[in-house]
Amino acid sequence: LHAPDGRLRLRNVLQHPLFLNNYDVIIVDSQGARSVMLEMIVLSATDSVVGMVNPVLPDVREFIRGTVNVMENLLPYRELGIPLPKVRTLVNCMDYTALARKTLDELAGIIQTGRYSRQLPEGAVSLLSTQIYDLNIYKQGHAAGQPVHRLEKESTRRSDSALVTMHSLACELFPEWKQAFDGLLANGGIRQ
């Protein structure tokens, strides 16, 4: 990883015909903390990366500072013809408090006005409309090793069911597959 081309190796591997011809999308999960691995993943992304943030002011500040810093440090790679992906921000562990709503509004304002960076191009960071609420169903899904959209199809609470939330997120991230996702939603999250 620390070789001169270390940060570009994953990008080069993913451009092999084995990947280009057989996969519509490749999703890579990373720890998120600043690391060479995170930089490799960002440089390998062809369209966008998803950054998750909790609606707590210190977390939001650290997310903006850390994410923007990583992206700004990778700007010189554009001179090598490597475009940087857009950062799509997903709010995770949202709750029903006024403080969380206020924090989310502040984050949205920072992103919409582009106050996160003087170096990154306009629109480099955006905020997804879908929010993942801090609900037990997500913990249950993790503990059971099951996708939450199969565990909770309907809900009586104010926030959407896990199925509707995952459908919204999938449609927002991959609008080209919305019709297929709509079919999955209509079938209660079960593929036909």
What role is predicted for each listed range?
Residues 11-15, 75, 170, 174:
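Generic structural signal for well-ordered alpha-helical scaffold segments
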Residues 9, 36-40, 143:
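Generic alpha-helical secondary structure signal
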Residues 1-21:
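P-loop/Walker-type NTP enzyme "switch/lid" segment
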Residues 16, 20-122, 126-127:
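Conserved catalytic-core segment of NTP-binding enzymes
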Residues 2-7, 59-66, 161-166, 170:
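Phosphate/oxyanion-binding active-site loops and adjacent basic polyanion-contact surfaces
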Residues 80-192:
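C-terminal lobe/tail of nucleotide-utilizing enzymes
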